[in-house]
Amino acid sequence: MASKAILEELNILSSKIFGTQYKSNNSRTGRKFVVQELKGAKLKSYYPATINYRQLRTLLNDKTFPDSDEELRMEIRKGRIRQGKGASKSKKK
C-alpha cells in the first residue's frame, strides 16, 4: 500500500500534468464559477433599455409635456443667479 506522502505527490504531479488545481485539504474554491464566461452582456441585451422623461420628449418631438425636474432645476438656478452665486460673466459668453 502506498503511503499518504506518495499519494499526495502523485496528486500534485497529476494536477500539474492535466492543468488542474491541487487542493491539499479538498476545500471548495469556487473556481468553476470564476472561470465561467460572464453573462452580464447577454442578460443586459435581453431587457429593453430604460428610457427617461427627457429622452421620451425628444423622441416624440413634443415640448408640451411639462418636465417638473427640469423646471425645479431652472428655478433653483435662477434663484442662485439672483443671489449672485451664478456663473461669472466671463463664462456666460
Swiss-Prot record:
Does the UniProt entry include the keyword Mitochondrion?
Answer: yes
One GO cellular component term noted in the UniProt record for this chain: mitochondrial small ribosomal subunit
The name this protein carries in UniProt is Small ribosomal subunit protein mS33
List this protein's GO terms for biological process: mitochondrial translation
* Similarity comment: family membership: Belongs to the mitochondrion-specific ribosomal protein mS33 family.
Instruction: Report the PANTHER family cross-referenced here.
Output: MITOCHONDRIAL RIBOSOMAL PROTEIN S33, SMALL RIBOSOMAL SUBUNIT PROTEIN MS33
Oligomer status and interactors: Component of the mitochondrial small ribosomal subunit (mt-SSU). Mature yeast 74S mitochondrial ribosomes consist of a small (37S) and a large (54S) subunit. The 37S small subunit contains a 15S ribosomal RNA (15S mt-rRNA) and at least 32 different proteins. The 54S large subunit contains a 21S rRNA (21S mt-rRNA) and at least 45 different proteins.
User: What's the short name of a Pfam family annotated to this entry?
Assistant: MRP-S33
